[in-house]
Regions:
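Positively charged n-region of N-terminal signal peptides that target proteins for export
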Residues: 1-4
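Bacterial N-terminal signal peptides
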Residues: 7-13
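Short, glycine-/small- and polar/acidic-enriched structural segments
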Residues: 22-161, 167-170, 174-181, 202, ...
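Short, surface-exposed acidic
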Residues: 149-156, 194-198, 227, 260-273, ...
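Secondary-structure end/capping motifs
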Residues: 222-305
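Conserved C-terminal helix/tail region of periplasmic/extracytoplasmic solute-binding proteins
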Residues: 293-326
């Protein structure tokens, strides 16, 4: 079984042996190029150089990063801001300390044969939507379009989509949720051509929310030793991300080396890394506060059922990146 030992257990110094600082990272999803920067940082010794021993935990359909960190199973998690803010409003004090992804990769992918050409055409159609926190951007978008999501006339029928593209292939839905770097290509690989599809990127529609940020528990940041570990972790992780952007094929192979399931393929991971690089491009890891505020505004635009009911305070900090990016 392929497994990469993250970081170094011991760093030998002139004065003796000093144990590396442990950091556990919980990913939002399974091992794939969506998280290449962290695997690359480990493989290239970036964490080791910072004196860190980083354990990377893959996610999955039954793993919620917020629940893992709440239970003490991770020091830092990768999550989308909508789900992090929703969790914060419900009492889990998650704080964004860095934002490697500058752009959103989320979109609706529709069959052209359904007649959908613009968002207004969603009316009276069935749309596949991911849940478990991934539904928040979609629900806000539909609210802004004035489309009810209860299946009533003139609204849309929401199909609770599994983490696959079957509803589109089987024509159970006119559109499904996809990521630019993953499920869209699963549709293409299934034999449907780009010309047979119509896509609506959340980024282009003006309803994008921030994805794949790094989150910790607020009270932990009060500990100077923990904060220092996070500064080192973010600095090393961003080195990994920039290397992955510049060397996408190599990064994809590093990801494959860490896929203990054997489910990923070289073709898919190289393609995914090429698309993910477009989303991390332009980010040095520091959160764009304007983008965060836009995310908040989008989530609060949910009419009678907003994702969050009040603008959060203390939901992000630049304290870590200010030091990490000096």
């Amino acid at each position: 079984m392929k497994k990469l030992i993250m970081g170094a257990a011991l760093t030998l110094l002139a004065g003796g042996a000093q144990a590396a600082d442990d950091v556990t990272l919980q990913l939002k999803w399974v091992t794939q190029a969506q998280f290449a920067g962290y695997y690359v940082a480990a493989a290239k010794g970036c964490y080791e150089e910072e004196g860190l021993n980083v354990t990377i935990l893959p996610g999955g359909p039954d793993i919620a990063p917020s629940q893992v960190i709440a239970g003490g199973g991770a020091d830092v998690v990768v999550d989308w801001m909508p789900s992090a803010l929703a969790a914060r409003e419900k009492g889990l004090p998650l704080v964004n300390i860095a934002q490697p992804f500058a752009s959103s990769g989320m979109m609706l992918t529709c069959l052209a044969e359904t007649g959908i050409k613009a968002p207004a055409d969603f009316a009276d159609k069935t749309l596949g939507v991911w849940f478990y926190g991934n539904e928040y951007p979609f629900l806000s978008w539909m609210s802004q379009l004035g489309l009810a999501t209860d299946g009533s006339a003139g609204g849309v029928t929401v199909l609770k989509q599994g983490f696959n593209v079957d509803p589109l292939l089987q024509k159970q839905a006119a559109c499904i949720s996809t990521m630019t770097y993953n499920e869209y290509w699963q549709v293409i690989d299934a034999g449907i051509t780009p010309e047979q599809l119509v896509t609506f990127k959340y980024q282009d529609m003006g309803v994008a929310t921030l994805e794949d940020g790094l989150y910790v528990l607020e009270d932990k940041l009060a500990d100077p030793a923990f904060a220092e570990r996070m500064v080192k972790f973010v600095r090393a992780s961003m080195k990994g991300w920039k290397y992955a952007e510049a060397n996408p094929d190599e990064a994809a192979m590093i990801v494959l080396d860490n896929d203990t399931t054997g489910a990923q393929t070289e073709v898919h991971q190289k393609r995914m890394m090429g698309e993910v690089a477009k989303l991390t491009a332009g980010s040095n890891g520091a959160l764009d506060v304007a983008a965060a505020e836009k995310t908040v505004a989008t989530l609060m635009a949910g009419g009678s059922d907003p994702v969050i009911t009040a603008a959060p305070t203390g939901a992000w900090t630049s304290a870590i990146t200010d030091l990490a990016l000096q």
